[in-house]
Amino acid sequence: MKTRTLVAVLAIFAMVSGACGGDDETDAGTTPATTAAPAETSAAPAADESAGGSAMSGLDIDAVLAADLDACVDAPSGDPIRVGMAMDFSDVVGFVDIPGSKLVPYVAALINCAGGIDGRPVEVRVAEVGDDAALATQELLDWGAQFLIGPPFADFALPILQTTGGGVPLFVAASTEPTLADMSINSYLVTFDDHGMAGAAAKWALDEGITRAIVFTEGEGIPYTGVNPDAFAAAFVAGGGEVVSTQTYVWAADTDFSAQVNEIAGISENNEVVFSAALAFQVTALRGQLEGQGLDGLTYIGTDALDATGISVEANNEGIAHTPHTSISAGDPIDTLLAGYEAANGEALESRGFMALYVDSMFLGIQGILDCGCDDPAGIGEAVQQISGFSGLSGEITYAGTNGIPPKAVPINRIVDGADVLVATIGG
C-alpha cells in the first residue's frame, strides 16, 4: 500500500483562520486524507485576522487550553516549530493513532491562537506509515520535522528509528513496550511500560485480598500480549499470590473460549482474578462464557487495551477493572480539551484516555526546543534527556536518570454502577 501523507497544518490553518474571520472552511475532524508531497502551510492565522492581545511566553499549557479560536491574539510570525507524526491507521492501533493524529493539530492551532511559542508558530504534519514506515519518516524529515511522534508497536517504530539513525527525538506516544525506550537512540515512552502497568494490576488484585489468578496470554515474551501477562504473573507471585491457570488465546480475534472455560471450570474456586491484555469485547465474551459455567465470583482486570476499545460501553462490564493512562473526570483539563475539540469539529474522539499522551508528546518536544534554545534535532534530544518534573496533561514526566521510560503512577479504573471511575492509583 502506498504511504499516505497529510499536511495537518492545512487543517490547522483552516481551523484557525476560519475561527478568526477567514472565508475558507476545512473539516479538520475527518480521517486524514491521502495526498502526495503536500505543500508547507503556516499553522497560524494571518495577523490582520487576529483579535490582538498579548502572546504567551514559552510553553504555557494553561494558556493553550484557555485559547479561544474565535478570539486569537496576534499571529506568530517567527520560524516554525515543525512536529512530524508517523502514525499507524491500521485496524491494530488505528483506534488510538487516528484520534491522536486529529487532536495534536487542533492543539497546535490553540498554541498558535495563543501567540505561538515565543512568537513561533507550530506546524504539524501527519504521515501514515502504511506498509513503508521508513518512507513516511523520510518524508517528515525532508519537510523539516524537528521531532517525531510515532506509533505504539515496534514493527513500525523500529523502521522509524532506523531511518532517523537515532538523531531525531521520537516519542512513541501510546506505547508501553519497554524495548522501544532507549535514550541512546532518542526514543522515549510518554507513559509507564508493560511492567509498570501489569505490576500495578497485580498489586491492586492483591490489595483486594485476591490470592489466586487466572492469566490469559498469547505466549511468553510476545510483545504486549505476552509481556503483560508475564509481568502480571511475576508480580502476583512475588506478592504472595498463586497463578492457578495460564490459558492461551489469539489477541483481537478470539471470542469463543469454550476450551479454556472448560479447563478453568475444573480448577476454579470462583474467587480468582482474571488478567489479560485482551480487548474489551474479548473480555466481556470470556466473562459471559465463564458465568455460563456458574463462575460469577471472578474479578477481571486488564490493560490499557480495555480503555482503548471501549470497556466503559461494553455490555456486562460491571466491576471490570483496567489500567488507563489517564483517569478523566468531568471538567478536568483533558475533558475540557476533548470537549473543545468536539465543539470545534463536530466529532467526539475515541480512546479518550490515550489522547493526552499524544499532546504531551508534542509538548515535550517543544520543551526540549525551549530548554536547548536550538532547532537541531540532536540538541533537542539532549535537552529532552534532561527533562525532570514536566507537568503534562497525562501527569508528571521525567526522563533525567532514566532510559526513556518516565516513572509514572498507574491509575486503576473500575466500572462501578455503570460508570468508569478511578478506584486506586499505584506507584509513581
Name each region found by the language model.
Residues 53-105, 127-131, 220-226, 350-356:
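Extracytoplasmic "Venus flytrap"
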Residues 344-355, 366-419:
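Segments of small-molecule ligand-sensing domains
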Residues 162-166, 228-325:
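Extracellular/periplasmic bilobed ligand-binding domains
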